[in-house]
């Protein structure tokens, strides 16, 4: 798997060859974040949420906790870069969704373009939020893959195809 930032056609973009994320695709960030947080909430309620599919792979619950933490860190970073007041740290996925939506909804054009200070290279607030969206969407993919692995391991084998 490879993901990262690339300068393509005068624009800095985030790409992932595992989940297919491509920040060049036009998206409504508010709607994309909302849909992703809904998916995470649903996946967090799965009967296998507390089980790890493999010893080194997080459970659905652990991924959801990581997503709350990642949203908290990124929103705090972007608030700081945009000169906005700190927000209350989220304690739940719904808090993280609300805080992320508030930031996306309230940023001005100039604030979207403000540079952040978390990377050793230039990353705007916009790109930091795009990175957060990728991280969250990728973890939806990770959780679903983990649940499928658990079901394959638990079920009575009828047929298996491997690639």
List the predicted regions and their residue ranges.
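Charge-rich, low-complexity N-terminal segments
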Residues: 15-26
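Short, amphipathic alpha-helical "lid/cap" segments that border enzyme active or binding sites
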Residues: 30, 34-37, 97, 133, ...
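Amphipathic alpha-helical hairpins/coiled-coils and adjacent low-complexity
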Residues: 98-101, 126
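Transmembrane alpha-helical segments of integral membrane proteins
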Residues: 108-114
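A short, structured beta-strand-centered segment in the mid-to-C-terminal lobe
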Residues: 88-99
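Short, contiguous, helix-prone interaction/anchoring segments in small proteins
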Residues: 25-54
